[in-house]
Amino acid sequence: MSRIGRLPISVPAGVEVKVDGALVSVKGPKGQLTLTVSNPIEVALEESTLTVSRPNDERASRSLHGLTRTLIANLITGVTEGYEKKLEIVGTGYRVLAKGSDLEFALGYSHPVAVKAPEGITLTVEGPTKLSVAGIDKQQVGEVAANIRKLRKPDPYKGKGIRYADEVIRRKVGKAGK
C-alpha cells in the first residue's frame, strides 16, 4: 500500500466535494476545480473524508495511487487557501511594470517583454523588482511562474535574472585575471 495514497483526505467545512465516477469536483470559497482520475484508481467519499484506493498491486496502479491522492489534496488546498509563488528580479535596469492585468518586463533586451495573465491567475507587482503569481491551481501557478523565470534565467556568474524568492543561485567563479 502506498504510504501517501493510503492516508485519508479530510474535507474542511465550506468545501463541497462531488465524486462522479472518474470525475472529482471540488468547490470552495476561492473557486472550483475538477480532476479526472486515471482508470484503475477509485475515489470514495464518506461524510467529510475522501479515500483513494487501488484494485490491485500492478505497477501502474501503485504509481498512480499516491499521485492521485496528492492531486486531490492539492485541489482542496487550492480552493480554500490558494497558491502563490513570489519572484525577484536582480540586475541593473531590470524591472517589472503592471499594465492592467498584464506585466511588462525590462530585462536588458532591446525591447520590453510583455506577459499576459492566463485565466485564473493573478499577477501582482509588489515593487519594481518583486512580483507574485497567485491562483487556485497549483500546477498552473507553478507553470506561469516558471515561464516568467524563463524570460531571463539567473546568471551563474553575476546572479542577474529572475529568480524565485526562496531560490539560492549557485555562483560560479569567473576566470582568474592576471
Curated annotation (Swiss-Prot):
GO BP terms in the entry: cytoplasmic translation
Keywords on record: Ribonucleoprotein, Ribosomal protein, RNA-binding, rRNA-binding
GO MF, any single term: rRNA binding
Gene3D superfamilies hit by this protein: Ribosomal protein L6, alpha-beta domain
PROSITE patterns: RIBOSOMAL_L6_1
Lineage top rank: taxon: Bacteria
Entry-linked InterPro entries: Ribosomal_uL6-like (IPR000702), Ribosomal_uL6-like_a/b-dom_sf (IPR036789), Ribosomal_uL6_a/b-dom (IPR020040), Ribosomal_uL6_bac-type (IPR019906), Ribosomal_uL6_CS (IPR002358)
GO CC terms: cytosolic large ribosomal subunit
Similarity field: Belongs to the universal ribosomal protein uL6 family.
Assembly information from the UniProt record: Part of the 50S ribosomal subunit.
Role according to the record: This protein binds to the 23S rRNA, and is important in its secondary structure. It is located near the subunit interface in the base of the L7/L12 stalk, and near the tRNA binding site of the peptidyltransferase center.
Annotated protein name in UniProt: Large ribosomal subunit protein uL6
Organism expressing this protein natively: Renibacterium salmoninarum (strain ATCC 33209 / DSM 20767 / JCM 11484 / NBRC 15589 / NCIMB 2235)
